[in-house]
């Protein structure tokens, strides 16, 4: 892969903060200054809210030692389903140096909240998909695919499965940064260790598992209640690649009386849609990829090199150059702000202690957590008054389009006038007990914009 932009990055380097505090020190790791400014640790100033979800909210922050902007993810300490520390642990397990992973600068308490400070990244693939009129060219999809196979291979090499594939969880770097053409993977709130840390053996095959992930992209076996493994992450990627090429998937827009029935319909439609039909009018390699990953055994290690080569050879055969000139290059990318992007995806989720929510219908007015309707492009945050995106790193585990929202916190806490770190949550939708779901209008960790109301726009 040739991440084109090798020119010198004239922006300050990512914040090299003090060693990450785990929140177990007796020394307070947050304070409020005399001017009422909230701090996380000794050097991270908490700014305005730029995202929210059932976990809590995401804030823009600044490292006062380096003047670098960061993302600060907040989760109420008394959350009924805390996951931020687990996500932090997974980030540490993945390491801070791998390409395409956000840096984690700090974890510790912040008043009534736990806080995780992360690198700021650019917009998600879903936002860029919107920007490109909801279709990507084959060249762009292949450049994305080759990178994401490598990202998933790396995650798997650290004994983790991701379980939350959706365009909202893959972000480019910030404009003008040397990482701007690299596709990053974020939000490990639904990740799971597939190698038992005690026995060092693969987790056992199980059935009758709750759905975990995003219904639009999840594997067929996940719909069937089978325990997920490496194969399921790769199948979900394949569904996402076809979503980008086609503009929609055959199982979008299905109606049902209950969420459980709807997820059942989505799974049934996936099973009944032949790969040849799903990939019709596109290169055979797309179908070959899906056939391969769907045939993998639960315990089997995928041949990542084979899959990368499949797409790399197609890329070369088409005469493309890996110049990182994606479809969105040259288009005006909006300045980041505090608007909330809502998605039309369908999520059915639980993960032991995590539940997910389903989006409201597109005819239902979607509002951000302040009750003000969101508008596409309503970016009221100027980072240093520069026109580069500074969307926060991990779309909070509860985020938008594909909608896998773990119900991390259900505090529904309202902010007091002087409380700069309140969390909010959405009211749960009643669903069958086997599938915990909550209504989804989730917001990304970075930003969520209300989509254009295209009449042809794809539905859940």
Swiss-Prot record:
Its EC number is 2.7.11.1. CDD domains: STKc_CK1_gamma. GO terms for biological process: endocytosis; positive regulation of canonical Wnt signaling pathway; signal transduction; Wnt signaling pathway. It is found in: Cytoplasm. Residues 361-371, 406-426 have a biased composition (Polar residues). The keyword Cytoplasm applies. Residues 1-36, 351-374, 402-426 are annotated as: Disordered. Residues 1-13, 351-360 have a biased composition (Basic and acidic residues). The keyword GTP-binding does not apply. Disulfide bonds: none annotated. This is Casein kinase I isoform gamma-1. It comes from Xenopus laevis (African clawed frog). The gene is csnk1g1.
């Amino acid at each position: 892969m040739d991440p084109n932009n090798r020119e010198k990055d004239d922006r300050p380097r990512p914040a090299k903060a003090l060693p990450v505090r785990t929140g177990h020190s007796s020394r307070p790791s947050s304070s409020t200054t005399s001017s009422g400014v909230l701090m996380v640790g000794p050097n991270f100033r908490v700014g305005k809210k730029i995202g929210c979800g059932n976990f809590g909210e995401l804030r823009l922050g600044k490292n006062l030692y380096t003047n670098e902007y960061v993302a600060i993810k907040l989760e109420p300490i008394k959350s009924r389903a805390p996951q931020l520390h687990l996500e932090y642990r997974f980030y540490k397990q993945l390491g801070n140096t791998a390409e395409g992973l956000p840096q984690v600068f700090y974890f510790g308490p912040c008043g009534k909240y736990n806080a995780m400070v992360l690198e700021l990244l650019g917009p998600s693939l879903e936002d860029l998909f919107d920007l490109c009129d909801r279709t990507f060219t084959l060249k762009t999809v292949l450049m994305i695919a080759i990178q994401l196979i490598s990202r998933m291979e790396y995650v798997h090499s650290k004994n983790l499965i991701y379980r939350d594939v959706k365009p909202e969880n893959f972000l480019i770097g910030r404009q003008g940064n040397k990482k701007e053409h690299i596709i990053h993977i974020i939000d490990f709130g639904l990740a799971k260790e597939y190698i038992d840390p005690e026995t060092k053996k693969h987790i056992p095959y199980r059935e009758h598992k709750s759905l975990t992930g995003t219904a639009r992209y999840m594997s067929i076996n996940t719909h069937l209640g089978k325990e997920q493994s490496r194969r399921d992450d790769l199948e979900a990627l394949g569904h996402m690649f076809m979503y980008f090429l086609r503009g929609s998937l055959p199982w979008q827009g299905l109606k049902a009386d209950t969420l459980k029935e709807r997820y059942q319909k989505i799974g049934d439609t996936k099973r009944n849609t032949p790969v040849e039909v799903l990939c019709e009018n596109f290169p055979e390699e797309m179908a070959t990829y899906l056939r391969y990953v769907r045939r993998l055994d639960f315990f089997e290690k995928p041949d990542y090199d084979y899959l990368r080569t499949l797409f790399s050879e197609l890329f070369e055969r088409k005469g493309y150059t890996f110049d990182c000139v994606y479809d969105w290059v040259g288009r005006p990318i909006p300045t980041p702000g505090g608007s909330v992007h809502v998605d039309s995806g369908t999520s059915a989720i639980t993960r032991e202690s995590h539940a997910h929510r389903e989006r409201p219908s597109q005819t239902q007015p979607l509002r951000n957590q302040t009750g003000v309707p969101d508008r596409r492009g309503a970016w009221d945050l100027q980072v240093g008054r520069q026109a580069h995106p500074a969307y926060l790193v991990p779309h909070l585990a509860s985020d938008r389009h594909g909608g896998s929202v773990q119900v991390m916190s259900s505090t529904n806490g309202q902010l007091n006038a002087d409380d700069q770190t309140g969390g909010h949550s959405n009211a749960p939708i009643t669903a069958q007990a086997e599938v915990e779901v909550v209504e989804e209008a989730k917001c990304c960790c970075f930003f969520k914009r209300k989509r254009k109301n295209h009449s042809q726009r794809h539905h859940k």
